[in-house]
Amino acid sequence: MLILVSPAKTLDFEQPPLTQVYSQPDFLYHSQELIQVCRQLAPSDIATLMKVSDKIAGLNAARFEGWQPQFTLENAKQAIFAFRGDVYTGFDADTLSSQELERAQSQLRILSGLYGLLRPLDLILPYRLEMGTALNNARGKNLYDFWGDILTLAVNKTLTEQGDRIVVNLASNEYFKAIKVRQLDGQLITPVFKDYKNGQYKVISFFAKRARGMMARYIIKQQINSIDELIKFDAAGYYYSEEHSTQSEPTFLREAQ
């Protein structure tokens, strides 16, 4: 079972990592090509392209300029400890055991605009380059064109190695669009999380993001390897609703908080 998640805008490079174990990203050659494109952008270009403030644009211009592909624990950090958004709050990597981190290294992949596809312990430098960015490059008009089939082929390779060929998509639509579903060599499961509000069950972004992280954690900690086990997920008051589900979109409901 392979889990796909999105990265986070919020980063933490201040706290030291909880393990000295690390790996290197698989697609640094491609990342370098993107960095060269980004270095041609003035801070004002970055502000417009990424729809960010001048301050954040200046910070990212400096990050692009200082980026270099020799990653060590002195200048970089493992992705799973560097990302600090709602998904990662739900996943709570800081409290996983070394064995569970090892399992996550095998089963969890983080889609990234700059790095393509990251394992949890892959080292990264701080960056901001969202997958939906319309960055013109030698391969096309955006990052979906840039990554092309690369990420889908990488996912298929991992599915072959794992054997069960189940992909659990816990990523946002923006990031999952980088995967070519028709080329996926496995069964795609996209869990949906809905909270009760104003008389109906609906997807509430903040809660759904955190629930995605909690489900990823559940899969790792409980060593889930089947859909029958997956739908037993019940963290934080969520429960599986067969009535609201389809075969590819198991839906989990939660009453008003």
UniProtKB/Swiss-Prot annotation:
GO biological process, one term: response to hydroperoxide
InterPro entries attached to this UniProt entry: YaaA
Entry's Gene Ontology cellular component terms: cytosol
Family named by the database record: Belongs to the UPF0246 family.
Identification of the protein by name: UPF0246 protein Sputw3181_3112
